[in-house]
Amino acid sequence: MAEYTLPDLDWDYAALEPHISGQINEIHHSKHHATYVKGVNDALSKLEEARANEDHAAIFLNEKNLAFHLGGHVNHSIWWKNLSPDGGDKPTGELAAAIDDAFGSFDRFRAQFSAAANGLQGSGWAVLGYDTLGNRLLTFQLYDQQANVPLGIIPLLQVDMWEHAFYLQYKNVKADYVKAFWNVVNWADVQKRYAAATSKTQGLIFG
């Protein structure tokens, strides 16, 4: 079974400054994300052993650990692609039209997404996702690394609201961090994810 690996970034750690510091990106990627990768591989190894021993209590424990660490790995893998030193501004084309249709305007979407991020209690993410059943865009608060986002949602844009993502630079002023985040959003990546979600998921989850 192939192991999960830490992805390389498309930009240097300092490339998102002054909006997100190089120190934060280095620790976030090389320490925190790496820990999730190790955690998911460890959980898979222990899960395989538990299944071989028919130890159902250990199976359930490691399935829970797998969900958490794999969620962390997936979320961060999207996060790095969602960011770019050439980001910011607004989306265009089909994604822009879909945002206008779902939220009324980009400014209304930005306000709703920012409110979801700033309003999170504890740790988690704000997510813009594509609902493959309703064929629409929705925003969610994702709790921890894996809770509160329903199955069938394809994540397009995420902002990490765990303290390790911002505290060294923004302290407890989450709103300033979220405001800075918009300056480095890689809309080309979000558009690519939207195009794939709308064209490649028909019938994948719902017949």
From Swiss-Prot:
Its EC number is 1.15.1.1. Gene3D superfamilies: Fe,Mn superoxide dismutase (SOD) domain, Iron/manganese superoxide dismutase, C-terminal domain. SUPFAM superfamilies: Fe,Mn superoxide dismutase (SOD), C-terminal domain, Fe,Mn superoxide dismutase (SOD), N-terminal domain. Mn(2+) binds at residues 28, 76, 160, 164. Pfam families: Sod_Fe_C (PF02777), Sod_Fe_N (PF00081). Its cofactor is Mn(2+). The keyword Transmembrane does not apply. GO terms for molecular function: metal ion binding; superoxide dismutase activity. It catalyses: 2 superoxide + 2 H(+) = H2O2 + O2. It is an enzyme of class 1 (oxidoreductase). Changing residue 98 to T: In strain: BC9405/90 / Serotype 18. Signal peptide: none annotated. Keywords: Manganese, Metal-binding, Oxidoreductase. PROSITE patterns: SOD_MN. Binds 1 Mn(2+) ion per subunit. Belongs to the iron/manganese superoxide dismutase family. Destroys superoxide anion radicals which are normally produced within the cells and which are toxic to biological systems. This is Superoxide dismutase [Mn]. The gene is sodA.
